[in-house]
Amino acid sequence: MVSSITQAEIFIALVVAAHAGVLAVRLCVSLYRA
C-alpha cells in the first residue's frame, strides 16, 4: 500500500507540532508572569 504521506512523515509532523506547542505555552507563561 503506497500513500502520499508516510508514517515517518506523520511522526515528524507530530513532533514538530508538539515542540511548537510547548514553546508557545512557555512563551505565554513567561509573558503572564512578567
Swiss-Prot record:
Record keywords: Membrane, Photosynthesis, Photosystem I, Thylakoid, Transmembrane, Transmembrane helix
- Location in or out of the cell: Cellular thylakoid membrane
> Mainly resides where?
membrane
Topology relative to the membrane = Single-pass membrane protein
Record's protein name: Photosystem I reaction center subunit XII
Q: Gene that codes for this?
A: psaM
* Keyword Ribosomal protein assigned: no
Listed under GO biological process in this entry are: photosynthesis
Domain of life, per UniProt, equals: Bacteria
Give TM segment ranges: 10-32
Lineage of source species: Bacteria, Bacillati, Cyanobacteriota, Cyanophyceae, Synechococcales
Q: Which Pfam families match?
A: PsaM
Q: Which residues form a coiled coil?
A: none
Originating species: Synechococcus sp. (strain WH7803)
Q: Which InterPro entries match?
A: PSI_PsaM (IPR010010), PSI_PsaM_sf (IPR037279)
- Keyword Cell membrane among UniProt keywords: no
Instruction: Note the SS bond partners.
Output: none
Membership in a protein family: Belongs to the PsaM family.
Q: What cellular component GO annotations does this protein have?
A: photosystem I; plasma membrane-derived thylakoid membrane
